[in-house]
Amino acid sequence: MIYIIGSGIAGLSAGVALRRAGKKVTLISKRIDGGSTPIAKGGVAASVGSDDSPELHAQDTIRVGDGLCDVKTVNYVTSEAKNVIETFESWGFEFEEDLRLEGGHTKRRVLHRTDETGREIFNFLLKLAREEGIPIIEDRLVEIRVKDGKVTGFVTEKRGLVEDVDKLVLATGGYSYLYEYSSTQSTNIGDGMAIAFKAGTILADMEFVQFHPTVTSLDGEVFLLTETLRGEGAQIINENGERFLFNYDKRGELAPRDILSRAIYIEMLKGHKVFIDLSKIEDFERKFPVVAKYLARHGHNYKVKIPIFPAAHFVDGGIRVNIRGESNIVNLYAIGEVSDSGLHGANRLASNSLLEGLVFGINLPRYVDSSWEGISTDDGIVHSVRISGNKTLSLKEIRRINWENVGIIRNEEKLVKAINTYSSSTQNEAIISYLTALAAEIRKESRGNHFREDYPYKDPNWEKRIYFKLVV
């Protein structure tokens, strides 16, 4: 039996692909609709346009990744994108005909379904998985059992010990809800990643947390304003109507997310209010019906300037894997946001996350019967970590500490404060927060999503990955 933990785009697409390849599959998720996929707004990046190519897509990905992309992975994902999209469409999913432009891309290459692509994909895949007869069970992963470097089973809250495990596929998502301001659901707390780390997987790139620049909260309802709004003409302004982003980057609203989030955050620290102006978008209600409905719920329309702020959105790091999704533990795969394939480097290109989930999920049947290759850590430094203690922290405390000390702008004092707070706790959320702060403290430079005001420049000596391995 192949067990998949997680019910987002990676887990569901892997389940369907494996089932259609004749494999026995069971999918377990702590909350079936609780992940990031149902709330993903933008789309799937793929070089399907006549003026585009996998090479151009790879170039954009590598440029935005700021020196830390795994080039082999980038070339694999961008070259597989078209084939995977064709497979997905052959399953019955229909994208809209127009391609959209998002920040960091040099071509229109974002496939979408209105402005709520993630929800449409999730609903489609969940229905398809059920039609394929895949058991989908709500339960929570507690522990992964490993012996002699190989998975032997796992433990869940309801089922207890499960031992009939041929392969275990983790698709449990990231941990951006561990920040006080977040665009993601409350299930996104990194527990799958922490459990895998405690079982012996190697984690990498934990310092690179991506903050989305355009999140709003009208009447307390947090809502992510999709990247494609800016591709279609939305402008970001301050209370004086100034498009201040051009003071930070010549691309203005179409600069990568790390630059925009930092710029908006700095403006807010200066005392400015920041808004998104949607009035320049043609045919707004047809192109963005979900945004229009959100605004209407709160008594607004697209001609009103909407207040925005940056919020934790995605994590580039995670369980280090190769292009097959294989970790350093035999028969333990990680796909989607829980993994670190090296695709995103120090900063993810918009709409590459849904693509990554589809590529690693749909292609998984190619590799499950092959001999295990595992990973290499030759492109970085492996740091051995011990975890101990019985300190207990509430999720509210952790979210506040991370936002204040391991957030958009970092420094030594704040990072050490966070490290000291988390170092005596074995809570899953504290372990992940500890490793994020520790990686950020170790990396004494600024690169991609990681910005330190005490080391504000990129250092070529730091063009290497930071790995963590648990020492028992």
Curated annotation (Swiss-Prot):
The active site is at R257. GO terms for molecular function: L-aspartate oxidase activity; nucleotide binding. SUPFAM superfamilies: FAD/NAD(P)-binding domain, Succinate dehydrogenase/fumarate reductase flavoprotein C-terminal domain, Succinate dehydrogenase/fumarate reductase flavoprotein, catalytic domain. One of its GO terms (biological process) is NAD biosynthetic process. Optimum temperature is 65 degrees Celsius. Thermostable up to 80 degrees Celsius. Transmembrane segments: none annotated. It catalyses: L-aspartate + O2 = iminosuccinate + H2O2. GO terms for cellular component: cytoplasm. It is an enzyme of class 1 (oxidoreductase). Pathway: Cofactor biosynthesis; NAD(+) biosynthesis; iminoaspartate from L-aspartate (oxidase route): step 1/1. Its EC number is 1.4.3.16. Its cofactor is FAD. It is found in: Cytoplasm. Optimum pH is 8.0 (for L-aspartate oxidation). Optimum pH is about 10.0. Stable between pH 7.0 and 10.0. FAD binds at S7, G8, I9, A10, S29, S36, T37, G42, G43, D191, E337, S353, L354. The record marks E102 as: Important in orienting the L-aspartate substrate. Keywords: Cytoplasm, FAD, Flavoprotein, Nucleotide-binding, Oxidoreductase, Pyridine nucleotide biosynthesis. Folds into three domains: the FAD-binding domain, the capping domain and the C-terminal helical domain. Catalyzes the oxidation of L-aspartate to iminoaspartate, the first step in the de novo biosynthesis of NAD(+). Can also use L-asparagine, but not L-phenylalanine, L-glutamate, glycine, L-proline, L-alanine and D-aspartate. Belongs to the FAD-dependent oxidoreductase 2 family. NadB subfamily. Monomer. This is L-aspartate oxidase. It comes from Sulfurisphaera tokodaii (strain DSM 16993 / JCM 10545 / NBRC 100140 / 7).
